[in-house]
């Protein structure tokens, strides 16, 4: 019988990061997935980039771009939370902790792209397989953590 403090269902970016954070807080975590192999999630197949922060960017500018892209049909508090908390989490989890190999410029800076609805370049990519790059690093970290059973 499998015993753990927490059961996480799914090992995409949401489930995987939740499992990793819970394990790092000292809990024993079991992760289950419907996929044939760990890492085969919707995250894995995502090709586009992920919102980060551009040069001279601000949470207010990002929030305005999200509202504009959503034709104003957005939950205001969710937009504010995403705009203020999203980029720092990309930095601390995906870049610093997991070391996701996002594309870089020749001088080593993150290569930021500009996608539809954004007024400035603030999107990080890992070639055209951003989701796979994120998922590969996330699964690697989960497998290496002594408190996670995958």
Question: Where on the chain are the PLM-derived regions?
Answer:
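Short helix-loop-beta connector
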Residues: 1-3
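N-terminal Rossmann-like FAD-binding beta1-loop-alpha1 element of flavoenzymes
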Residues: 5-31
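Conserved N-terminal/central alpha/beta ligand/cofactor-binding core
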Residues: 34-150
């Amino acid at each position: 019988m499998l015993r753990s403090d927490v059961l996480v269902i799914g090992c995409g970016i949401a489930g995987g990061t939740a499992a990793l954070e819970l394990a790092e807080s000292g809990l024993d975590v079991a992760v289950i997935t419907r996929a044939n192999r760990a890492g085969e999630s919707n995250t894995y197949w995502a090709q586009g980039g992920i919102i980060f922060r551009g040069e001279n960017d601000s949470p207010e500018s990002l929030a305005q771009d999200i509202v504009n892209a959503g034709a104003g049909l957005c939950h205001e508090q969710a937009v504010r939370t995403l705009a203020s908390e999203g980029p720092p989490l990309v930095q601390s989890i995906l870049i610093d902790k997991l070391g996701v190999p996002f594309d870089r410029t020749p001088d080593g800076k993150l290569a930021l792209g500009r996608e539809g609805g954004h007024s400035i370049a603030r999107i990080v990519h890992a070639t055209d397989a951003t989701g796979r790059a994120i998922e590969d690093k996330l699964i690697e970290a989960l497998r290496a953590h002594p408190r996670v059973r995958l």
